[in-house]
Amino acid sequence: MLSLREVLDDAMKRKVAIGHFNISDSNQLNGIAAAAREVGVPVIIGVSEGEREFVGGKKASAMTRAASKEFGIPIFLNADHSHSVDGCKSAIDDGFDAVIFDGVELSPGENKKHTKEVVEYARKCGRDVIVEAELGYIGTSSKLLDDVPEDVILDALPSAQDAAEFVSDTGVDALAPAVGNLHGMLKGRSNPSLKIELIKEMREAVGSDVSLVLHGGSGLSDDDFKKAIDAGMNLVHINTEIRIAYRGGIEKALKEKPEEVAPYRYLNKGRDAVMEVVRDRLQLFSS
């Protein structure tokens, strides 16, 4: 099968995007894998620090490899939002295909310093591990929000020059810039619109060897997704939307059969709900 780097490069050339979806258990993983097989595209599984603590890094790696073999499609594993260098190193040691060093709350200099340390460790590990970093603050929530958090300033965004300098100074393979996006989903309305021209400028500035990653994809309109991908984003993260679908499917199953106590008889409804969301997103990202 193709490597993650080859998959991302191909997506960039074809102006499509690879979907990245977070999991907390094997049930969600199976729903995502089934959707990717149906659409016929590779997919990336993400596990945040909290999700890694719950699932276990080595277990997440083993589950992902097993799912890729079972479903017959490329499935890759990413250590999502690691806030420490040691966390990234641990994920690399556990066999992850990609890691994200999230240093946006550090000073710009410290963010670059720690990101570069992760890049250097990845280059020496004996495998082709993708290293991603974040540039600009878009919040930390994965919940339904009443409004944009006060600490997220949608107009204070990094420039294309900032993006190019960060890539040059750190050597990252992928960059997730703030472009008007937001972690979490706003209740009853779409998330703020993206700065499409800024994405185009950043794509030009960082070059064709670096993936541009859209975080905070949950809550965006289909039109925003398409415009962002056309402008140069070749990897899209979805998490909150998956969590809402999973919980909703399980709650619906228990409401229909409140006496049910066998987990496999109601958890599968959550899996099916996840599969539906992922299928729709993958079809959109790859069209």
Name each region found by the language model.
Residues 1:
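Active-site-facing substrate-recognition patch
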Residues 4-14, 26-51, 58-74, 81-209, ...:
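Alpha/beta enzyme core
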Residues 16-24, 51-52, 265, 269:
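A short N-terminal beta->alpha junction/helix N-cap motif
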Residues 19-24, 77-82, 209-220, 238:
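Histidine-centered catalytic micro-motifs
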Residues 220-287:
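C-terminal alpha-helical cap/extension of soluble enzyme domains
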